[in-house]
Structures are given as C-alpha cells and as structure tokens.
Amino acid sequence: MRRRLLPLAKLAFGLILVLLLTGCGYSLRSNDVLSSQFDTLQLQLQDPNSEFSRLLRRSLDAADVTTNLLQSNAQPGTDLAILSVGNEQLANRPVSVNPRARAAQYEIRLSIEIALSRGDSELIPRETMSVQRSYFEDIDNITGNRDEVQIITAEMRRELVNQLLRRLQAPALES
C-alpha cells in the first residue's frame, strides 16, 4: 500500500513546489523585456568581425531585436537606440608563483567599453564591463595550457555578452 502512495506523494510534492514558485513570482529569465524595449538597435562596433561582436549580434537576434551595423562615418538615426561597443581588452597577469619562482596561477581579465544612447540622451553612459577568471599553468603541458586559455576566453566572452544583455534589460532604461 505504501509503495503505491510514494509516487503520488512525490507528484503532489512537485506540484505544490511548482505552484509555490509561480505564486511568489519566480520565472525563468527571458529576453522579452529586451525585445519590448528595443525593436531595432543600431550597433557601433569597433571590430564588427570579432568573436565578441558575432556573439552579441547572435544573442540580440535570439532576443528578437533587429540589429543594424552602423558605419563609423554614417549619421545615426535620431529615434533609434545606438549601442557603442569598444574593442575587447584581454589582460593576463600572474597571481601566484611556484617554488621555482615561475608563475603557477594566472588571472585573465576580459573587458569592453559600452555606451547606449538614443538621440541626444544617454541611456547608459560610457562604462567598462569586465569578467575575470584564474587558471593554473601546467609547466609540463604547454599545449594544453593554450587550449585551456582559449576555452576560458570563449566562456568569458559568452558571459560578457550575457552581462551586457542583462545591463540592457535594467529597469533604469525603461524611462
């Protein structure tokens, strides 16, 4: 008898948990806010062919935001929002050393400068966004270290794009 009630109890518990979460206002993060704020976004990119720029355009397209690349000498439309993104800066510095006085751990910092404007008003004044990670260097596996740095840098770019999208969704932009 108890074996038959156990699956029902699990189902009831799961259902109650879902109802409680939706009742308190919890919902998965979505890009609806972004697409409702910006139908079209003009992008002024320092390097339109960089990996960061491609990830940003792909993410904005996934959020149903139409993007137009703005050439550096072109006159922007007055009623459209312009997102200016500078070149990504990648800095690498040693954090710790091993007994042989060689760097054992490094910190990688990836940063970009952004600004958002519409007409004469600045929605987001020029600011720097950054992400940092650390990794251990294996002296015996230099090739593996390079691969690890490339993987970490790609993850950091994705995180920086997500950070930028969340910044664009900020409630301060609703005015």
Feature roles, as predicted:
Residues 25-28:
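Bacterial signal peptide processing site
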Residues 20-23:
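C-terminal motif of bacterial Sec signal peptides marking the signal peptidase cleavage site
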Residues 81-128, 134-147:
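Surface-exposed short loop/turn segments
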Residues 39-89:
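N-terminal segment of the mature soluble domain
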Residues 45, 60-67, 89, 116-120, ...:
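Sec/Tat-exported extracytoplasmic proteins
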Residues 143-175:
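C-terminal/domain-edge helix-coil "capping" segments
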Residues 2-13:
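Bacterial N-terminal signal peptides that target proteins for export
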Residues 36-44, 141-146:
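Acidic/histidine-rich, surface-exposed loop or edge segments in extracytoplasmic proteins
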